[in-house]
Amino acid sequence: MKIAVIGAEKVGSALGSGWAKAGHTIIFGVRDVNKADLKALCARTGATALASPDAARQGDVVVLALPWAVAEGAVKALGDLKGKIIIDSMNPLAMKDGALELERGFTTSGGETVASWLPDSRVVKTFNQVGAEMMIAGDRFETPPVMFLAGDDDTAKTTVAQLVSELGFDALDAGGIKQARILEPFAMVWINQALFRGLGRNWAFGVLRPKG
């Protein structure tokens, strides 16, 4: 599968590296294809780098891994993505009164906002619930950690669930894209524990089921 990863910073490079290892063709979509660290990333993973609209055009799946502050302009500049599967890994974070908070909350979500920017695409919210370090660390756990996903198109969710599983996670369907309203605040639990409560970044969420 050709996967276009829009953004090649921590999240984008982690996801692209993981799926390259799983055998997918990775195309990083960036503003500057000549950056030294990007060239090193492509050499390490076998990926290629193109201007973001060109990468998105070529991808069977398009992954959005951008800072929320620049997301709207960058996504709208991608061009016609009609029918494409879009993975939204972004959390709508912003600084408010000196603290990191969600810009959107329980009455709307970043996932729904992305879907409104791309009304003819099939948007699936996932990979927003842990830090970049854990996104390709699923196979390091004795029991696969959980990664929820939300979207309105069941066929798209099936494809995305397979991609989630390939990175070592137990993919669980949270429902329609409206459920991004709970997945994005859920991500704040990881951020709070990892960055402010001393747990560190080397952990993920799991689902425990009773024996028998």
Give residue spans per PLM region.
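Rossmann-fold NAD(P)-binding glycine/threonine-rich loop
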Residues: M90-E133, A137-D139
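NAD(P)+-binding Rossmann beta1-loop-alpha1 motif at the extreme N-terminus of oxidoreductases
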Residues: M1-T45
